[in-house]
C-alpha cells in the first residue's frame, strides 16, 4: 500500500501520514532558527516520521552531544552497480576478479581532494568532521544539538515513544552548503526514533534448565554434541547441530574435510552477549573457534532488550564451521541508522570476512519513514561487499509476508524487510524442518495459529527485480511492478533461499548458562553462512564466493531442496499469500541448500 497523506490541524506545519493503518507524524518546514551568514544551503533528505503514540516533550537540549554521518555518493554509481553485478556473475569476464578496499576507494570512493574540500566546507560552517572511512564515502561529524540546530537549520524535538523509550528527532531536512549537498547521499544519525529488531524467536512457553556438565558422545556425522545438548534437544524438540548438518548434506565431501579452515565469518550484532555461554558451548561440541570482537561506535552496550540473538549466531557458526575464524562486530542499537551504516561500513572496509551474516532488520516502509537515506546508503556498502567478494546473508524476518508486523501489531500490509531485500544481499527465509533425511522434509515455516512466527517473504517496495533474478517461478501470478513503481517490469522478490527456522523445532543452544531451543530466520541466516564457509574452505585454495545470487538463480533443478508446502500469511489476512509452489516462490525462495550440490557448482570453472 502506498503512503496516504492527510492533513490535520496541527501547529508548525505538520502532516499526518498513514501507512497500512498506522499513523506517523511528519514535520514540514523547518522550525525558525537563528540565521547565519555563509554559503548557500540546500536541504538533504527528509525528517524522520514520528510514530503514532509518541508524546512530544519539548525541544532537544542544546548541550546534548550529537554525532551524525555525512554519507557521500560513490564517484560513479552506475559503474559501481555494473561492476558489482559483473564480478558476481558466472560467465562474465570480470567474474571473481574482486577488489581490495583500497582499490574500491580509488575506483569508486570520492577522491582525496574532494573529501578534503568537503571537510573544509563543514569546518567552515562550524562543524567538526572526523576522518573519512576507508572507502572514502562516510564522514562522521561531532557537534551538539544546539549547534546542529543553528548550522543545519533544523529543529530538534524530544519524544517519549509508545514503548516508553525516550527519543530525539530532527523536525526538518538538514541543510548543508550547496557544494556539499550535491555530493551527499544521506545524513544519518540526527535522530534515534527507529530500532532494528533481531529475527530470533524462542519456542513459545519455553522453559529453561540449568546446563549439565559437558560430556562427549560418540561421533556420528558432522559436529558432535555433548549429552547436555542432546538432552536439551529432546526436551525442547530442538535440533542439535550434527542433525542440521546432515539435513543440509554438510558432510566431509562438501567441505573437503576442512570445515571452514582458512575462512573468516563476520557477524553483524547489536545485542550484548556473555563469553561464558560460548565457552560452555565450545566445550560441549569440542571446538576451539577463535572469536574476535570488534566494537563499532562503542559497541553493543545493553542492547534494546534481552534476546539470545548474538549467541545464536555465534554458536551456529561455531558448530557448523568449527575450523573457521569468527569476527563479531558490535554497535549500539539506539541510533539505528548511523550505527547500522557504521557497522556495515566497518565490516566491509576491514575486508577480513569472506562471509557475513546479519539477523537484524526493519520493514522497508518503516526504514523509509524513520531513517530516510539509510536504504540507499546500505546499498552502496553492499555493492562494495560484492565488489570485494564478500557473501552477505540476511534474515528475512519472522512475521511472514507482513514484515512490518514485527515492529507494530497494527501493520499488517504485505511488506518485506531491509536489508534482506537489498539487491546485493542473499535474503534467507524460514522452513519448518520435520525430518532430516536422507532428503529433508520441509515446509514453509508459519506458526500463525500460536503466534510463533513465520518466514519473511514477498515483494520489495523499493527495488526493481535485478537481472539475475530469473528462472522458473520467479515471474508468477503474484509478481508486480506496483510496489516499487516499476511500470515496465517487476520488483525484487524475497527470500532467495530458506532454511530451518521454526522455534518449535529450533536449535539447541546455550544462553545465560542454560540450554534452550531457539529459532527464527535469525537461525537460518547464520546456518547458510556457515554452510558456505565450509564449502569455500574446501576449494583449492580457499576462495571467496562473492555475492551468491547470480549463481544460485542459474543452478539446475535438484541443486536445492524445492519447498512445495505451506504459505507465509502470518496474520491470515491476505488469503494465503504467499504459497509455496514448484520452483521459486515468495515464501521459500529457491528452496533450502544442499551443500554437496552447491559445492560442486562453486568448483566448476566459469
Write out the residue ranges for each language-model feature.
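Short, surface-exposed polybasic-and-hydrophobic patches located at secondary-structure transitions
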Residues: 439-461
Amino acid at each position: 500500500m502506498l503512503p496516504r497523506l492527510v492533513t490535520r490541524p496541527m501547529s508548525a506545519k505538520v502532516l499526518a501520514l498513514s501507512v497500512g493503518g498506522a499513523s506517523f507524524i511528519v514535520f514540514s518546514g523547518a522550525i525558525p532558527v537563528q540565521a547565519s551568514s555563509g554559503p548557500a544551503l540546500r536541504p538533504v533528505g527528509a525528517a524522520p516520521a514520528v510514530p503514532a503514540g509518541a508524546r512530544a516533550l519539548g525541544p532537544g537540549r542544546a548541550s546534548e552531544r550529537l554525532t551524525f554521518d555525512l554519507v557521500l555518493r560513490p564517484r560513479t554509481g552506475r559503474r559501481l552497480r555494473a561492476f558489482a553485478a559483473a564480478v558476481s556473475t558466472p560467465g562474465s569476464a570480470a567474474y571473481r576478479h574482486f577488489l581490495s578496499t583500497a582499490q574500491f576507494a580509488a575506483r569508486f570512493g570520492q577522491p582525496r581532494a574532494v573529501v578534503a574540500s568537503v571537510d573544509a566546507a563543514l569546518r567552515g560552517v562550524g562543524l567538526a568532521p572526523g576522518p573519512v572511512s576507508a572507502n572514502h564515502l562516510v564522514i562522521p561529524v561531532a557537534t551538539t544539538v544546539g549547534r546542529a540546530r543553528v548550522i543545519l537549520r533544523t529543529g530538534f524535538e524530544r519524544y517519549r515513544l509508545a514503548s516508553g523509550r525516550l527519543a530525539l528527532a530532527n523536525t526538518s531536512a538538514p541543510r548543508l552548503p550547496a557544494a556539499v549537498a550535491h555530493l551527499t547521499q544521506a545524513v544519518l544519525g540526527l535522530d534515534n526514533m527507529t530500532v532494528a529488531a533481531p529475527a530470533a524467536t524462542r519456542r513459545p512457553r519455553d522453559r529453561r534448565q540449568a546446563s549439565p556438565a559437558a560430556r562427549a558422545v560418540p561421533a556420528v556425522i558432522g559436529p558432535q554434541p555433548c549429552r547436555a545438548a542432546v538432552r536439551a534437544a529432546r526436551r525442547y524438540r530442538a535440533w542439535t547441530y550434527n542433525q542440521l548438518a546432515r539435513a543440509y548434506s554438510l558432510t566431509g565431501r562438501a567441505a573437503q574435510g576442512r570445515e571452514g579452515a582458512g575462512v573468516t565469518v563476520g557477524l553483524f550484532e547489536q545485542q550484548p552477549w556473555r563469553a561464558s555461554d560460548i565457552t560452555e558451548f565450545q566445550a560441549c561440541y569440542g571446538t576451539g573457534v577463535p572469536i574476535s570482537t570488534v566494537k563499532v561506535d562503542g559497541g553493543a552496550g545493553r542492547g534494546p532488550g534481552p534476546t539470545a540473538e548474538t549467541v545464536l549466531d555465534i554458536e551456529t557458526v561455531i558448530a557448523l564451521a568449527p575450523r573457521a575464524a569468527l569476527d563479531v562486530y558490535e554497535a549500539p542499537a539506539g541510533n539505528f541508522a548511523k550505527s547500522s551504516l557504521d557497522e556495515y561500513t566497518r565490516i566491509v572496509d576491514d575486508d577480513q570476512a569472506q562471509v557475513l551474516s546479519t539477523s537484524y532488520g526493519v520493514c522497508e516502509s518503516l526504514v523509509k519513514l524513520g531513517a530516510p537515506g539509510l536504504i540507499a546508503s546500505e546499498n552502496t556498502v553492499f555493492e562494495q561487499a560484492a565488489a570485494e567478494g564478500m557473501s552477505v546473508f540476511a534474515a528475512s524476518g519472522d512475521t511472514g509476508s507482513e514484515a512490518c508486523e514485527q515492529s507494530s501489531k497494527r501493520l499488517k500490509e504485505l511488506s518485506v524487510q531491509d536489508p534482506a531485500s537489498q539487491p546485493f544481499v542473499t535474503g534467507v527465509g524460514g522452513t519448518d524442518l520435520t525430518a532430516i533425511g536422507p532428503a529433508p522434509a520441509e515446509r514453509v515455516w508459519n506458526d500463525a495459529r500460536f503466534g510463533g512466527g513465520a518466514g519473511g517473504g514477498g515483494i520489495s517496495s523499493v527495488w526493481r527485480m535485478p537481472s539475475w533474478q530469473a528462472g522458473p517461478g520467479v515471474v508468477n501470478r503474484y509478481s508486480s511492478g506496483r510496489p516499487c513503481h516499476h511500470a515496465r517490469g517487476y520488483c525484487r522478490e524475497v527470500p532467495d533461499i530458506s532454511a530451518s527456522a521454526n522455534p518449535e523445532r529450533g536449535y539447541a543452544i546455550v544462553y545465560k548458562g542454560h540450554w534452550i531451543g531457539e529459532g527464527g530466520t535469525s537461525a537460518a541466516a547464520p546456518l547458510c553462512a556457515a554452510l558456505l564457509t565450509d564449502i569455500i574452505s574446501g576449494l583449492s585454495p580457499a576462495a571467496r564466493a562473492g555475492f551468491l545470487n547470480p549463481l544460485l538463480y542459474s543452478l539446475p533443478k535438484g541443486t536445492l531442496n524445492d519447498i512445495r508446502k505451506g504459505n507465509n500469511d502470518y496474520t491470515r489476512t491476505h488469503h494465503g499469500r504467499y504459497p509455496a509452489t514448484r520452483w521459486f516462490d515468495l515464501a521459500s525462495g529457491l528452496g533450502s541448500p544442499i551443500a554437496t550440490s552447491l559445492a560442486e557448482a562453486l568448483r566448476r570453472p566459469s
